[in-house]
Every structure is written in structure tokens, then in C-alpha cells.
Amino acid sequence: MIPLKIAIAGANGRMGRVLVEAVNNHPDTVLSGALEHSGSEALGLDAGYAVGLKTGIAISDDVDAVLAQSDVLIDFTRPEPTLKHLQKCVEKQVNIIIGTTGFDDAGKAAIRAAAEKTGIVFAANFSVGVNLTFHILDTVARVLNEGYDIEIIEGHHRHKVDAPSGTALRMGEVIAGALGRDLKQCAVYGREGHTGPRDPSTIGFATVRAGDIVGDHTALFATDGERVEITHKAGSRMTFAAGAVRAAVWVNGKTGLYDMQDVLGLNNR
């Protein structure tokens, strides 16, 4: 089997370094390129320097050159650079795995449009456990559909720039969808001051940013006399990286927009 050639965007970032390691660990993939922004101090260094690997791939800011020798790009950066990389992937007929969060509606529309021409796996979280949690939440919300207050609590490291996390929002979307609600209409983000009694139709969000928390997410369903809490805690970024590489292998040869539920066979298509 010819190894799948994978490039990593943001290769010197916290997630990018782990992605380099994950590609190296997978028996069916090979690192074909590593991207960083112009001016990065890491340009020219071996992509594996930070994790003790010698990959033979130098970190570059030449997107065209990197994509020309790659089958797929994995991007866990920020919305603006991800959308630029997305357009390049369409031009070069390179598939893309998007783990970036914080897109606005226009950004999501651009991803949907690009999926008509290339294969995209776009997910809020690439952990197998988190995606199984999404699947479970759909069932739980359908059963606990009356008389339960729903809150989503998430925690991440001090460096995370968007809140609530993409995973927390996806949990909210899954729950709202199961209940026949529109999350944009029923979400409450944080509470302060005299808020009055809780509206039973709302889904609340609370955010923690502290230390080096990799990712903690809890969906709470509470009523008189009982609470149901569904929690996922990530202890290492490798769980996300390994899932992203799995998605890259899965989407090879496909066109269209997919998520991690598709990769794991949890969606009925």
C-alpha cells in the first residue's frame, strides 16, 4: 500500500506538533509537508524537532509547494488561515481535515461550498470518545425531553482563544436538534447579576479557562430529585491527533463534506 501523504498546517503549534507525531506513528501515512506562517522562528527546522523526531521535512511557509506533494492537509489553526488553506486545497485537488473552531456562518458556508470540489472532514472534535458522546447525547436528550434543565460546562487551557469551545457548541447543537429546538434561539452563554428564574427551554453554557486543561466537557440534565451528567475528559492532544489522521485516511478518494460521525460509521448516509 502506498502511504498517504499528509501535510500539517500550524506544524509548530501545540496541536501541530502532536499531529506530526501522529502521522509518524500511523503505518499507512507519511509526512509530506509542514506549514507555518511567514516570519515564524520555526521555518527551516525539521518538522519533528519539538517531539524528538527526524522527519526530513522542513517547516515551510510555501503553501503551494507543500500541497503540490500532498494528498491531504490537516489544519487545526484559526479560521482566517484555514479558509485560505481551504481555497488552495480546492485549487490543488487536495483533501482537507479541518479541526479549527470558531468559524462564523460565512466561514462555514465557504467550507460547504468547497466540499463540492474536494473531500473535507470538518469536526468540532476528532476524539473517538467525544464523538461517541455526541451519539449518546442525542439519545439521552430524546428521553429526558421534559422537565430537565440542560447545562453544558467546558474547560480548556489558558491559551484557547474561542469560547465556548467548538465541542461544547456541537454538544448543544446535538441536544437542541434532538429536542426540535434551534440552538441560536435557546442558548444562554454565561450568567451575571439578577437573571430571574431559569427559562426551561434554554440550554446554558459555562466556560472555564485555566492551566493546561486539554479539554473537559460535561452535559448536565437536571430535574427535581436527580441529575444525569455525561462527561468526557481528554488527557492528551494525541486523542485528537490520532482521530484526525484516521479521518485523513478515511476521506482519501472521496468528495464531499463529512464529519467524524461519518468516519466512525455513526451517521446513516
UniProtKB/Swiss-Prot annotation:
Family annotation (CDD domains): DHDPR_N
PROSITE patterns tied to this protein: DAPB
Predominant localisation class: cytoplasm
EC number: 1.17.1.8
Keyword line: Amino-acid biosynthesis, Cytoplasm, Diaminopimelate biosynthesis, Lysine biosynthesis, NAD, NADP, Oxidoreductase
Active-site feature positions: H156, K160
Swiss-Prot/TrEMBL GO biological process terms: diaminopimelate biosynthetic process; lysine biosynthetic process via diaminopimelate
Sites where the protein binds (S)-2,3,4,5-tetrahydrodipicolinate: H157, G166, T167
Domain of life: Bacteria
Subcellular location: Cytoplasm
Job of this protein: Catalyzes the conversion of 4-hydroxy-tetrahydrodipicolinate (HTPA) to tetrahydrodipicolinate.
Similarity comment text for this entry: Belongs to the DapB family.
Protein name in UniProt: 4-hydroxy-tetrahydrodipicolinate reductase
Organism encoding this protein: Neisseria gonorrhoeae (strain ATCC 700825 / FA 1090)
Gene behind this protein: dapB
